[in-house]
Curated annotation (Swiss-Prot):
EC number assigned by the record: 4.2.1.20
The protein's role, per its UniProt record: The alpha subunit is responsible for the aldol cleavage of indoleglycerol phosphate to indole and glyceraldehyde 3-phosphate.
Transmembrane stretches, start-end: none
PANTHER family: TRYPTOPHAN SYNTHASE ALPHA CHAIN, CHLOROPLASTIC (PTHR43406:SF1), TRYPTOPHAN SYNTHASE, ALPHA CHAIN (PTHR43406)
Highest taxon in the source lineage: Bacteria
Organism listed in the record: Aromatoleum aromaticum (strain DSM 19018 / LMG 30748 / EbN1)
Record InterPro entries: Aldolase_TIM, RibuloseP-bd_barrel, Trp_synthase_alpha_AS, Trp_synthase_suA
Major enzyme class: lyase
Pathway the protein contributes to: Amino-acid biosynthesis; L-tryptophan biosynthesis; L-tryptophan from chorismate: step 5/5
Protein name: Tryptophan synthase alpha chain
Catalyzed reactions per annotation: (1S,2R)-1-C-(indol-3-yl)glycerol 3-phosphate + L-serine = D-glyceraldehyde 3-phosphate + L-tryptophan + H2O
Length: 271
């Protein structure tokens, strides 16, 4: 059982929801990424999604695009992202880390070389936005062979065939994109999410995390009533953008604690 799978199993036993924050490696500066990851854990993160910056992040809204631009300007590369995870692991061996990004940097490195390096850095999962499950069985197999969970996206427009494809090649959890659009979008249709999640869970058989459009503790709590996990990214990036460096970690921790407290008010298992 992977670290991600055991995390969800432990949370399910206690009826808690996973809190999965996202930040971009190298934003606002490479030397601040590990302190920010530690701040996320202090704020109640169960799993960390660490963005690999890319020059054309097609699924991301303006906030995360700006974070990628800053990280790239700071010289962040896929290899440096792996070095960052390795540094994080010197102080935290428990919290699962999922790399989230796009295919181009991985293909430039080479899939086999990437999964080997990710395993050595103690990465736990990888979510490649532009790898459709029906076209990347070899990548998913290589990831699993290296002990990494290949994680895939589902959306309101996903077909039952896409559900079956994800169930066949994915592991760890499902990232359900709750909106048609890009990250950071403002309006969530809670009723649509509540209707869709049980269908996904029944057909795919994995925990379901919901992201896109979660802006505050209240929206996180409402999503937590139906989902196994809440993924929140753009709002954290905004906190990073507005915070002075000497308050950066403290502000991120404080915001995440509000979300964690709200999630912990949700009672009972969603299964």
């Amino acid at each position: 059982m992977s670290k991600i799978q055991s995390t969800f199993q432990r949370l399910q036993v206690t009826g808690r929801r996973a809190l999965i924050p996202f930040i971009t490696a190298g934003d606002p500066a490479p030397e601040l990424t590990v302190p920010l990851m530690n701040a996320l854990v202090e704020g109640g993160a169960d799993i960390i999604e660490l963005g690999v910056p890319f020059s054309d992040p097609m699924a991301d809204g303006p906030t995360i695009q700006r974070a990628s631009e800053r990280a790239l300007a700071n010289g962040m590369t896929l290899r440096r992202v792996l070095d960052t995870v390795r540094e994080f692991r010197t102080g935290n061996a428990e919290t699962p880390v999922v790399l989230m990004g796009y295919a181009n940097p991985i293909e430039a490195m080479g899939v086999e070389r990437f999964v080997s390096a990710a395993r050595e850095a103690q990465v736990d999962g990888v979510l490649i936005v532009d790898y459709p499950p029906e076209e990347c069985e070899s990548f998913a197999r290589a990831a699993k062979d290296a002990g990494l969970d290949p994680i895939f996206l589902l959306a309101p427009t996903s077909t039952e065939q896409r559900f079956r494809d994800v169930a066949r090649v994915g592991s760890g959890y499902i990232y359900y994109v709750s909106l048609k659009g890009v990250t950071g979008s403002a309006t969530l249709d809670f009723d649509e999410v509540a209707a869709r999640i049980p269908q996904i869970r029944a057909q795919v058989g994995m925990p379901v995390g919901v992201g896109f459009g979660i802006r505050d503790a209240e929206s996180a709590r409402r999503i937590g009533e139906v989902a196994d996990a809440v993924v929140i990214g753009s709002r954290i990036i905004e906190e990073i953008e507005r915070s002075p460096r000497d308050r950066l970690a403290a502000n991120v921790t404080a915001f995440l604690r509000e979300v964690r407290t709200a999630l912990d008010q949700v009672e009972g298992s969603v299964r």
